[in-house]
């Protein structure tokens, strides 16, 4: 059976999430969906999967059910397909933020930084500069272990362990960005949306966010100017530029990503350990 995988987020003020949670959970279970939906006062972030009829019904539910008062009427979804269900269960969780940055003054609902679509970005990278002749720098806003699976060529990567560290590292390294067109990016767009706003607020000029993130870029232009795969937070582990699951796996012991190359190491024992485990043990 073909499984449809949907990802979406939307920054919008929500004040009834406690009442919504059991109703949304019940609807997902009724449709046989699995995945995770985060609800917070600042919006919604979701990753769900199921048969086509079920995902279509859920999209219609979010966009049109009177319960949501039109809050999700314009919610846009990114879609990919898989041969099996990548999630084990269905969770609807309440959070303070749909992506934790610990900068409560940043409210994307009140205004976004400019965005650049995939085709325009590819044209800039092909030329080596934007439409005004400024050099383009790609800024990866993801965690270090995600970057190691794949990223844009020559992207800036500050090796953060969690997104809440992003403001601090940008404040310390803003000289890297001066005089350039900065394009922040992440998996699906949610982190780079907050990241771009922060950079604008601290006075960095010519900042853009990649519309729809890496996955939308793959969908529209493939893997141009990108090397490796894209880590995803489900049991597929990583998607290639054709949006197909790869042979990468997640280590059962330490949760590190184990690429096909790393699986050739004698330190890789399926279900038990991996090269990252061995490295951590040696450093202990």
Swiss-Prot record:
Q: Which SMART domains match?
A: RHOD (SM00450)
What Pfam families does this protein map onto? Answer: Rhodanese (PF00581), UPF0176_N (PF17773)
Question: EC number(s)?
Answer: 1.14.-.-
Source organism (scientific name): Burkholderia vietnamiensis (strain G4 / LMG 22486)
Its BP terms in the Gene Ontology are:
tRNA modification
Q: Does the keyword Oxidoreductase apply?
A: yes
Q: What is the lineage of its organism?
A: Bacteria, Pseudomonadati, Pseudomonadota, Betaproteobacteria, Burkholderiales
Q: Which family does it belong to?
A: Belongs to the TrhO family.
- Protein origin, superkingdom: Bacteria
Its EC top class is: oxidoreductase
Q: What CDD domains does the database record attribute to this sequence?
A: RHOD_YceA (cd01518)
**Name assigned to this protein:** tRNA uridine(34) hydroxylase
Q: Which GO terms describe its molecular function?
A: oxidoreductase activity, acting on paired donors, with incorporation or reduction of molecular oxygen
Membrane-crossing residues? Answer: none
Name the job this protein performs.
Answer: Catalyzes oxygen-dependent 5-hydroxyuridine (ho5U) modification at position 34 in tRNAs.
- Location of the active site: 186
- Domain Rhodanese, residue spans: 132-226
The UniProt keyword set, sorted, is: Oxidoreductase, tRNA processing
């Amino acid at each position: 059976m073909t499984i449809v995988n949907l990802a979406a987020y939307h920054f919008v003020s929500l004040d009834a999430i406690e009442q919504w949670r059991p109703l949304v959970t019940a609807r997902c279970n009724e449709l046989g969906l699995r995945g995770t939906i985060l609800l917070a006062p600042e919006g919604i972030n979701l990753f769900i999967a199921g048969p086509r009829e079920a995902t279509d019904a859920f999209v219609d539910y979010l966009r049109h059910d009177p319960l949501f008062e039109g809050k999700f009427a314009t919610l846009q979804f990114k879609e990919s397909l898989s041969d099996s269900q990548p999630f084990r269960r269905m969770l609807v969780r309440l959070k303070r933020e749909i992506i934790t940055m610990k900068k409560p003054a940043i409210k994307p609902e009140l205004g976004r930084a400019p965005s650049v679509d995939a085709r325009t970005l590819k044209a800039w990278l092909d030329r080596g500069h934007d439409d005004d002749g400024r050099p383009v720098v790609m800024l990866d806003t993801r965690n270090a272990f995600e970057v190691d699976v794949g990223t844009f060529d020559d992207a800036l990567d500050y090796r953060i362990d969690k997104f809440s560290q992003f403001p601090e590292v940008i404040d310390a390294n803003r000289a890297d960005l001066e005089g350039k067109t900065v394009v922040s990016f992440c998996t699906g767009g949610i982190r780079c949306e907050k990241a771009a706003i922060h950079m604008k607020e601290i006075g960095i000029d010519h900042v853009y966010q990649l519309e729809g993130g890496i996955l939308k870029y793959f969908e529209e232009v493939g893997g141009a100017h990108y090397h490796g795969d894209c880590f995803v937070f489900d049991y597929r582990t990583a998607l290639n530029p054709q949006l197909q699951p790869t042979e990468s796996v997640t280590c059962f012991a330490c949760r590190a990503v184990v690429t096909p190359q790393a699986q050739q190491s004698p330190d890789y024992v399926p279900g038990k350990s991996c090269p990252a485990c061995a490295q951590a043990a040696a450093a202990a």
